[in-house]
Each structure stands twice: as C-alpha cells, then as structure tokens.
C-alpha cells in the first residue's frame, strides 16, 4: 500500500433497482435488463480489481449498452478510465454515475478521490463529505481518510486533522489515517504524539519506506538515538534501494 496517495475503496457491486413497470410484462423485461446489467457490472468490477483492464472494459461496455444511465456501471467505468489515465473520460463517466443516482456513496467517494487526485481539492472534499454523510455506507472511515489526505494537499491541516480523527474514531487501526496523523503531528512540531501514531501504525500494518523514514525523523526530533538507529536499520535492510533509504543522511543526519 502506498500510504502517500489517495486510497481507492473496494468497488461496491450493489446495483440500485429503481422504478416500477406499469404491467407484469414490462416488469419482467425491466427485471431481466437489470439482472443482465448487474451481471456485467460485477464481472467488470472483478476483472478491474484483478488488473484485467481490457476484459473489464468489455464487460462494462455491455452493462452500459443495456442500461446507459446505470449509476454503478458508470461509476466503475469511470474508475477504469482513471486507471487508464484517460481523465476526460473518467470525469464524464463519474458525472453520469452521479446523474444516475446522486445518493450513490461509492460514486461520490470515487469521484471525490478522483477530483482530489486531479488537484480540484475543494470540489473533491465536497463529494467525499456527501459519501461520509451516508450512515449506511460501509467505507466511511476510508472516505474521511481520503478527505484528510486531500486537505493536507491544500494545505489545511486543522480541517485535515478533523477528518483523520473521524476516520480513526470509526476504525482505530486504519493504517493510512495513523500514518497521516503522525505526519501532521510531526509537521506541527508535536513529536511525542507523532511517535504514538507511528507506533500504532506499525502495530496495524507492514513496514513501508515512507513510514520508516518518518519514524526516523520523529525519533531524531525526540533525540532517541537507539530508536532512531533501529528504524534506520529496518529501512536500510528492508528497502535498501528506496529513495527513503537514500534520504537518511539528509533527513536525520545519518551516515550513508
């Protein structure tokens, strides 16, 4: 996991069934159409998560041919286009997803993360806040984490901290929120709280170069030479070719 970037949530495969037909025949036809759409959406999402982008695109195109305005089909197609770095198409499909169902929290979340990634921070946070306000949405911790990361880019540390703390209130072991709270605390000169957050991070997640370098900086600020040396050794041993390992001598006054 790259904790320095926005976290894209697992794709929700719930397709909203909307409306009632005026006759049994039309109801049956609509139900058939929805089932076909849902099947292609689920297949497309599965292929996307496995990195099989071409096959995922084919399935999602079939879903959209069947139901062009389906919110979840457009949402997942938007994520696919984002992965393909076709940002214009991603934006178009995200807008269609929200037009199809403005209360789809998965679409609001993914679109908000996309906007933050593209530098549209205020608009991104607005969509993330809409997703976070849905009490039935199972990824509210991740939404708050993404909003916090987005606001750190602005930068707006006080508001970012509010979202990150909300994420930890929902999930006290959420690694990204722990890491970014450690970073926020360290950046504001609060090295002791930063130590607490980074220690909790290591208890709930695997080592990463970014987290180990931050831990080295924190212990350097706290003048704990033993802890600093221990984290530095882990960084050099586990990630010897990482940029973070190369930064040790400048980041915390350590020899190459």
Predicted regions and their residues:
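Bacterial Sec signal peptide processing site at the extreme N-terminus
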Residues: 17-36
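Terminal, low-structured helical/coil segments at or just beyond the last alpha-helical repeat
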Residues: 27-28, 34, 203-256
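Register position in tetratricopeptide repeats
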Residues: 49, 83-84, 117-118, 134, ...
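Structural marker of alpha-solenoid helical repeat scaffolds
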Residues: 32, 66, 99-101, 134-136, ...
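Helix-start (N-cap) detector for alpha-helical repeat units in TPR-like alpha-solenoids
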Residues: 30, 36-38, 71-72, 105-106, ...
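Canonical tetratricopeptide repeat
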Residues: 42, 76-79, 110, 144-146, ...
